[in-house]
Amino acid sequence: MQPVYIQRIASIHPQGKRNDSRPYLQACEPDYKNIITNPTLRRRMSRIVKMGVACGLECIGGLPPEEIQGIITATGLGCLVDTEKFLNTLIDNEERMLNPTPFIQSTFNTIGAQIALIRGIHAYNMTYVHRGLSFESALLDAMMKIGEGSGHILVGAMDEMTDTSHAIQQRLGILKGIEAGEGAQFFLLSREAGEHPLAEIKGIETFAGQQTTEEIQNRIMRFLQRNGLNSRDIQWFMTGKNKQQSWQDNSSKQTIISEKDVPLNQAITSESNAIYEKLETNLFPESMHLSFKDECGEYPTASSYAVWKVVKESENCTTPTNILIYNHHHSINHSLILIRKSV
């Protein structure tokens, strides 16, 4: 596959900070007035739209719009606040005299479209909503576009958490023992390395379904072999270990919707971190072990924060470094991302 280089990165994330008034990690947001300068446009944006648009604009910087051949965004749950607002209004007004703005702003492609409109980028614009593999799908699309000849592609992922969504996921048992989070990350990818690329994306693979540790190990080994590597060549191994919740566990009050949800909840509570620990011990005992969800929390596109973190932390590397990121979302959606940092 055509080499793909990361030229710029931007992130809005919780930074590991906890808000006592929220049972999840909440993103530390910047002053949007300095990034989204149009006050009318900014006022109409919901919180996640402002997060995503500001992060994307920061990543683009002063790059001329004609040099960007595509904007590809990803989200697992979309604009939850606007969706909730529209549905509540629908109920309160008995389906009459509805304000269309929350509905328009709640569509999944809103963020990519707003970035294109603000910067005047008339190019390929796509949004992926593939649950826990949304970011990986967007990244793979960007790599294929670059392989077809595109110069610069802007790739981003974002998800927000709301009190309503958190309460629902807790009742379903999805967040038992898991600290939820949110955030937005953007990456400017290019075909050419240029003078100072931040890193190179060497490969990506996704797979879905319940997997045993042995099956995951075999997939990782085959993935590395296809990229001319073995487990001893990986200097950094980053996993999605999730920090256990520090507040009261309300598991006794959780509601399981149907019997088919029981295996999923058992996997989340007992196997989530165990899979990562077994891989660290069995495949990468000599690699440096890193994690990222203790800083950003669990959300469908959290793997985008993992990529941002390894690129940021590898800036001062003095030797070539191979970095493998393995993440699974609720033990169902699995992804492998191979990154190389050259000197």
Residue ranges of each PLM-predicted region?
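Conserved "HGTGT" condensation-loop signature of ketosynthase/thiolase-family condensing enzymes
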Residues: M1-Y124, Y128-E136, M144-S150, M158-V343
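Internal active-site segments that recognize and position negatively charged phosphoryl groups
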Residues: D141
